[in-house]
UniProtKB/Swiss-Prot annotation:
It comes from Mus musculus. Its main location: membrane. Residues 282-344 are annotated as: Catalytic subdomain B. The chain crosses the membrane at residues 5-27. Residues 1-4 are cytoplasmic. This is Inactive polypeptide N-acetylgalactosaminyltransferase-like protein 5. Its cofactor is Mn(2+). The lineage of its organism: Eukaryota, Metazoa, Chordata, Craniata, Vertebrata.
Amino acid sequence: MKSVIIQGLFCGFLAIGLWASMLLLFLHLEQEDMLENEKEELLKKRSLGKNAHQQTRHSEDVTHDEVNFSDPELIQGLRRYGLNAIMSRRLGIEREVPDSRDKICQQKHYPFNLPTASIIICFYNEEFNTLLRAVSSVVNLSPQHLLEEIILVDDMSEFDDLKDKLDYYLEIFRGKVKLIRNKKREGLIRSKMIGASRASGDILVFLDSHCEVNRVWLEPLLHAIAKDHKMVVCPIIDVINELTLDYMAAPIVRGAFDWNLNLRWDNVFAYELDGPEGPSTPIRSPAMTGGIFAINRHYFNELGQYDNGMDICGGENVELSLRIWMCGGQLFILPCSRVGYNSKALSQHRRANQSALSRNLLRVVHVWLDEYKGNFFLQRPSLTYVSCGNISERVELRKRLGCKSFQWYLDNIFPELEPFNTERKRKKNRF
């Protein structure tokens, strides 16, 4: 009797196990079918060989409802991604944005034979649709013969939809996108260097993972560098609102910074645009944002890439800006190239990087500011005795490149940056 009961229990457990296995298999196959159907539907909408200069409209009309700030899902998305994830899902992986270029820019034509571009996009825990919109906009709005590749560098993202699901969706782009997954957290700066090391295009174009390019965005960048391989160029950075995700045109500005080494945008005066090129005139810029710019691949390597001793992100934009100008290059903003950017002001990731940012800025100060470093410490006295690590390699790089002094940079590139109390200011006050 006892053996019969045991046999019955064994058979029962076996049946339950088989049933559970079949259920899991069914759910897995159902999920695969759903993803396959979604992918097939998206493939029907896309043809990489057609309409290279036109962006495909999303199939559904998106209505921008009033933002409900009490919605727990909205708050969760802001905390998790730094943007309105509800609206992002509603927009999907591609959309049409307004052409924010001046009419003069819209009438410009560029040579067919330009250098090829490798687009490098690094991401960490990015919202899925936001990342795919960045990729889709590049594919849809870039001439295919100039687009060598898009290199995505995943810096050990933790979100599930950035793993197998992302791999699956990237098949839509038919091999145009290469995905690199870091084996450990490297931070944005080193991730960019990893992406650049795998690039094969003539020009490296760095983009953030939460941006969307506009019409004829790539050609002006490539054309400028084709004329001077030591010219580094940036687009005008339009605004994507983190709550509504509306795309808004930005005015023509130049990059600058203060003695905290914080990037700021300075207005360009109307008389500077009075020449024959009008509002399409390239703008000489003392500094640039770190996330969106184009540079000749060989020149990037010759110039020393990024400072490998910097962590995560922050400060690398000022460091590279100084190195470009002081070591024989030029930095310009091109009004005819437009890229929208979501600043994600509420992002937890940005708030968590203050320690790394301070260390990065100290490396800039001790390598590049010469006798003017005291102006930084007047603003940030708490960092006076903080270590910035070993900078001997970067000091040697500056010597090897034959770079000019920071005094030269202030006199010739950025005279608007007034020192607080230095010999330069005392000399100026004598006259």
